[in-house]
């Protein structure tokens, strides 16, 4: 049976993650309150931010920025966008 969670991002019961994506309390919070769909959507957005803003994951400030944006993304606050990005036509 599939595990479901009340998704913090989409405000509905959705399929949950199979395991916490991070170690510790932060990972457990995401596991318990973020759906697999919201996590996949965040990973796509995170990739856009890393590429378009040229973030370096070896840089502590860039990692801190991305962590803050993830918190905003899941809590429904306004979060950073990749300026000038135009999604490909389907």
UniProtKB/Swiss-Prot annotation:
One GO term in the molecular function aspect is: iron ion binding
State the UniProt keywords alphabetically.
Answer: Iron
Q: State any GO BP term from the record.
A: cellular response to oxidative stress
Under InterPro entries, the record lists: Fe_traffick_prot_YggX (IPR007457), Fe_traffick_prot_YggX_sf (IPR036766)
**What is the top-level taxon of the source organism?**
Bacteria
Q: List the disulfide bonds.
A: none
Pfam families reported for this sequence: Iron_traffic
Key word DNA damage present in the record? Answer: no
Q: Which family does it belong to?
A: Belongs to the Fe(2+)-trafficking protein family.
Chain's role? Could be a mediator in iron transactions between iron acquisition and iron-requiring processes, such as synthesis and/or repair of Fe-S clusters in biosynthetic enzymes.
Q: Which HAMAP family match?
A: Fe_traffic_YggX (MF_00686)
Which named protein is this?
Probable Fe(2+)-trafficking protein
Q: Specify the species.
A: Pseudomonas fluorescens (strain Pf0-1)
């Amino acid at each position: 049976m599939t595990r479901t969670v009340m998704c913090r991002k989409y405000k509905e019961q959705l399929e949950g993650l199979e395991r916490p994506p991070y170690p510790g309390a932060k990972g457990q919070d995401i596991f318990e309150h973020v759906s697999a769909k919201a996590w996949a959507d965040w990973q796509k957005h995170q990739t856009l931010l890393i590429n378009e803003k040229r973030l370096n994951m070896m840089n502590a400030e860039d990692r801190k920025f991305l962590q803050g944006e993830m918190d905003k993304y899941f809590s429904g606050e306004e979060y950073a966008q990749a300026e000038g990005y135009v999604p490909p036509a389907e």
